[in-house]
Amino acid sequence: MIGQITSGLFGGPDDSKKLKGTVVMMNKNALDFTDLAGSLTDKAFEFLGQTVSFQLISSVQGDPTNGLQGKHSNPAYLENSLFTLTPLTAGSETAFGVTFDWNEEFGVPGAFIIKNTHINEFFLKSLTLEDVPNHGKVHFVCNSWVYPSFRYKSDRIFFVNQPYLPSKTPELLRKYRENELLTLRGDGTGKREAWDRIYDYDIYNDLGNPDEGKENVRTTLGGSAEYPYPRRGRTGRPPTRTDPKSESRIPLILSLDIYVPRDERFGHLKMSDFLTYALKSIVQFILPELHALFDGTPNEFDSFEDVLRLYEGGIKLPQGPLFKALTAAIPLEMIRELLRTDGEGILRFPTPLVIKDSKTAWRTDEEFAREMLAGVNPVIISRLQEFPPKSKLDPEAYGNQNSTITAEHIEDKLDGLTVDEAMNNNKLFILNHHDVLIPYLRRINTTTTKTYASRTLLFLQDNGSLKPLAIELSLPHPDGDQFGVTSKVYTPSDQGVESSIWQLAKAYVAVNDSGVHQLISHWLNTHAVIEPFVIATNRQLSVLHPIHKLLYPHFRDTMNINAMARQILINAGGVLESTVFQSKFAMEMSAVVYKDWVFPDQALPADLVKRGVAVEDSSSPHGVRLLIEDYPYAVDGLEIWSAIKSWVSDYCSFYYGSDEEILKDNELQAWWKELREVGHGDKKNEPWWPEMERPQELIDSCTTIIWIASALHAAVNFGQYPYAGYLPNRPTVSRRFMPEPGTPEYEELKKNPDKAFLKTITAQLQTLLGVSLIEILSRHTTDEIYLGQRESPEWTKDKEPLAAFDKFGKKLTDIEKQIIQRNGDNILTNRSGPVNAPYTLLFPTSEGGLTGKGIPNSVSI
């Protein structure tokens, strides 16, 4: 469309010395929450005249005065706007004409320099030259903020959408390519400013605030053998006054301003949606708290009906002058979200999927077990390969930590099999949180948390569902760690007080699983481990590099969401510490778990085999055979994994035909070296790192990176509200131990088991805070880009990769159809379970909002 309009306006037979182009951009005001009325169409003309200049750089004609780099064209300036491309309230994009002087010797442009002498920054989306003689259309994908030139130490340069390996870069563009990478790396000094584009590394030394007292001191994560950690983005903030090794923090009110490279910040719609969801959750959070002030038992839910009131009914939106004044003060995008017509009133929480169909089915043993395969944390369960289960903790430090579960506890529930027979038939499985928690449990229980380390044994029934057999709850020995643990084993019951005790035992398991999920499965294994890949890719791979083009969409918004997490979620006293049972030990515990992180094991087939829930099988479609056939996460995940791998293989094979091409790619080798030695530097000496010497190693590594950033994150994130939005199903904290006979708590359990249950799990205030958080995290923003989609259809000029990407998209569409078909198959009982919640977390696409489906390209929330 742009081409037709520009040809009509500017083309003609007499323009042989002129080259016509179209610039698409947005100005700052279009993205300003407080001044949406100042739309681009009103402000566009600020950039006309000579405030913004463009100079093309030839890829074929050198400049003898400039070290034989590509020759620059004369400056060209924006002409009158041609048209507005998008609605005003969406952050308007406007197209401008631009005319360059051109001659035959100049040839094909390979890059351009832009200079902004205006006082404001603007967002440059693209430049398109519609008809370069003897070449046709030349397109530059920009998608970058351009600040006034005095903010930069070097020229802003953008390259054509033609990928080049370093050795195949046109000679006249080579120096520009190298210099741009130097600019993005910076020199490792100084405090970063809002306009900076520098990517650099740092350790997690900014979670605590020692200037505010000892209670706000937190362990530095990364840079030590004791607490290794992936690196984060460097901000360069000064150290704290009391500890020169800790980085100072910015005030909470300025949280949105925490530094990330400018183009890593949330876009207009993403920020608007994010703030809207936060506003809704705050309102929903405050109102029940106000109501609780007039309650006889503040900070306690008195019954399950009390809990359900969070979701049912609620306070309807008021009408009248006050409401009109409120809506007048909120930006238009926020008003649209706040006044949604999908049944989500502003003053109540949406009903979580787990209680939509039935208010009680979540309490069944079948649903408890099913969520280990199809819930929000389906990545922990493993096959039991020795009985009783043995601990891997050092016995010199922790004594005997082996399980006390015996055959007598479980053999009456094995359908006539012995334990050995059940194990040999791959019928026994375990959800094991024991070894992860025991080293910290004594300290955790000095806080308001009172909990156990759990092991749960399960039996695979003939209908494909899992049946809980026994739950072991353990505490550190009261005489010291070296004496091991004290443990008690609980078995299923549906009669009297024993039934209530069994429900509590499952709740303690859910508390364990919730904390491990949030800290390990979610934060550590997706958010934290992917950030070094974001940084290294921008520092070492030019935007011209084909692997940069492959991976870049899978890093969108990750640095920004992680930076905000450090500021308000995972920091000392932050929301995470306030809502998970690990409390102030949470992040330190995740560093200890990172010691066991192995990059190749993050590949889905490798993970399934390592957990024993699959075996290698070359005759199976994905190279592995599942031992639990109806394992929704694994079944859907393997199809997504294979689609990603096929796409990555097609793409990489187009650029690399031999080992030699991998080895001589200096950018690729520098990228991989920096990832190992700096980004994940605490693991630089691990023998499992791929050597990056063969195309297959590149394909496998990129597939794993994309899997982590897209499907793995989707599987462990977007089910949070559907399953944990109803806190009794997945409590995050337990506040007292299992009641013992002869105590008042035990008598209460007999007389009012529901109240005893609610007094044991997460308190009302923590529940509201936690539910508010996961509602935000479980939503898709309206500008989300999903797996198989790209921001620009012209992201590359190479036709074969474009065709391969189209094939990838069609494969994902086929997978969607297969997921729908499987969810409709009544034989597959684990797909929906007793709560009738079809498994859609790995359904590739979604609309915006709280949908429980959709795989965004990146860790973006």
UniProtKB/Swiss-Prot annotation:
Induction: Up-regulated in roots 2 hours after jasmonate treatment and 24 hours after wounding. Not induced in the leaves. It catalyses: (9Z,12Z)-octadecadienoate + O2 = (9S)-hydroperoxy-(10E,12Z)-octadecadienoate. Pfam families: Lipoxygenase, PLAT. It comes from the Eukaryota. Its cofactor is Fe cation. Its EC number is 1.13.11.58. InterPro entries: LipOase (IPR000907), LipOase_C (IPR013819), LipOase_C_sf (IPR036226), LipOase_CS (IPR020834), LipOase_Fe_BS (IPR020833), LipOase_plant (IPR001246), Lipoxy_PLAT/LH2 (IPR042057), Lipoxygenase_dom_3 (IPR027433). Pathway: Lipid metabolism; oxylipin biosynthesis. Residues 29-160 form the PLAT domain. Binds 1 Fe cation per subunit. Iron is tightly bound. It is found in: Cytoplasm. Highly expressed in tubers and roots. Detected in flower buds and leaves. Keywords: Cytoplasm, Dioxygenase, Fatty acid biosynthesis, Fatty acid metabolism, Iron, Lipid biosynthesis, Lipid metabolism, Metal-binding, Oxidoreductase, Oxylipin biosynthesis. Residues 212-246 are annotated as: Disordered. Plant lipoxygenases may be involved in a number of diverse aspects of plant physiology including growth and development, pest resistance, and senescence or responses to wounding. Catalyzes the hydroperoxidation of lipids containing a cis,cis-1,4-pentadiene structure. Linoleic acid is the preferred substrate, but is also active with linolenic and arachidonic acids. Monomer. This is Linoleate 9S-lipoxygenase 2. It comes from Solanum tuberosum. The gene is LOX1.2.
